[in-house]
Amino acid sequence: MNFRAVLAMLVCKALRLVSRILHRGGTAMPGRIALKIYPELLSLLAKDVRTAAVTGTNGKTTSSRMTEQAFLEQGKSYFANRSGANLISGITTEFVINSSLSGKCRKEYAVIECDEAAARRVFSQLRPQVIVVTNLFRDQLDRYGEVTHTLENIREGIKGAPEAVLCLNADCSLTASLANDLPNRAVFFGIDKGAAPSRP
């Protein structure tokens, strides 16, 4: 850990503590400032943590909580961004508060909900082992644009995590299409019995 990385963590932890004392929430702001001090901080802290990332238009929080329950039942040591801060700044804060100043995470696993618009930037730094994509619909057009733009954001994000196993909704054709042009191993889930099979 170099000086700037340690400084970024110290500032983030201090701001998070002050925000909690003042009851201001303060999940995103500490991470935003930490990344200005050391832009590679998330990548540094996430490299030794086995991470499941969940993104998509609907169902991110529910799917994340279901993943957490599976970890609980298996007795796994994990943390999650339950606060709903699912952009890169909030995700960075969660990694900082779950790590020592040496950069060692106190948990073995992480369950991270990621805003679909942030996937392009987050996945390349997070390098998750599993990426769950729930579905893709037109949503908040003023913020996200057309759904094809959101699909491209997620696709570009996955390209930054080539080792990740994709868990895709086979009942959503746009989501399932991510398996067609990416080298990642893909498995599928869905209600329809004709859901796409796993692809090696």
Regions found by a protein language model. Name each.
Residues 30, 87, 108-112, 142-146:
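Short, flexible loop segments at the rims of nucleotide/cofactor-binding pockets, characterized by
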Residues 1-53, 73-74, 89-97, 198:
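Short, basic phosphate-binding NTP loop
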Residues 52, 79, 130-132, 167, ...:
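Hydrophobic/aromatic beta-strand patches that form the interior of the parallel beta-sheet core
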Residues 49, 106, 137-200:
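Acidic, Mg2+-coordinating active-site environments of NTP-dependent enzymes
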Residues 74, 126-127, 181-184:
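Short, structured coil segments at secondary-structure junctions
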Residues 90-133:
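Conserved nucleotide-sensing/catalytic segment adjacent to the nucleotide-binding pocket
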Residues 72-73, 129-138:
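Gly-rich Lys/Arg/Thr-decorated short loops/hinges at beta-loop-alpha junctions or inter-strand turns
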